[in-house]
From Swiss-Prot:
MF (Gene Ontology): unfolded protein binding
One GO term describing the cellular component: cytoplasm
Family: Belongs to the SecB family.
Protein name from the UniProt record: Protein-export protein SecB
HAMAP family to which the protein is assigned, alphabetical: SecB
Length: 172
């Protein structure tokens, strides 16, 4: 009798058939914290202003592997001076097997950033606190809505581009 317990998942040596999504690796690609006006900025009164910039980049590594990098820059200013700048590039390598292009696009545009975002949130918060500033927590981001908006804009741009090219340059 075997002491091995299985939960119905495929054993590593068994071939997995059908569409498959795997997380191969999650890692920090780049991280930076700058507080150029400390310690003077700690005494600034007033409400700080925050500017968040978020984007993602996808690179195909091979037929079934993709690297997604979630890049976040958070800049805090107080009384017109930069209090801090946090920059994080959190990356992951994801395996996408047996999926069509549409499904790959959806996973890379929604599921992969949703997997990476908690790592970004934690790292940004920790860096800010270690830097001597009050905690800041990145609020949840609806990557599904962002992906849908990107598709809508892309379709609109293609539609406008085809309308422009379908009109003659001039009439004689």
């Amino acid at each position: 009798m075997s002491d091995e317990i299985t939960n119905g998942a495929a054993k590593p040596t068994e071939a997995i058939s059908g569409p498959t999504f795997t997380i191969e690796k999650i890692y920090i690609k780049d991280v930076s914290f700058e507080a150029p006006n400390s310690p003077a900025v700690f005494n600034e009164a007033g409400q700080p202003e925050l500017q968040l910039n978020l984007n993602q980049r996808v690179q195909r590594l091979n037929e079934n592997a993709f690297e997604l990098v979630l890049h976040v820059t958070l800049t805090c200013t107080a009384a017109g001076k930069t209090a801090y700048v946090v920059e994080v590039q959190q990356a992951g390598v994801f395996g996408l097997f047996g999926l069509d292009q549409h499904a790959i696009g959806v996973l890379l545009g929604t599921q992969c950033p949703n997997i990476l975002f908690p790592y970004v949130r934690s790292l940004v918060s920790d860096l800010i606190q270690i830097g001597g500033f009050p905690p800041f927590y990145l609020q949840p981001i609806n990557f599904d809505a962002l992906y849908a908006e990107t598709l809508r804009q892309r379709a609109q741009n293609e539609k406008e581009g085809s309308q422009i090219s379908s009109h003659p340059a001039g009439n004689a």
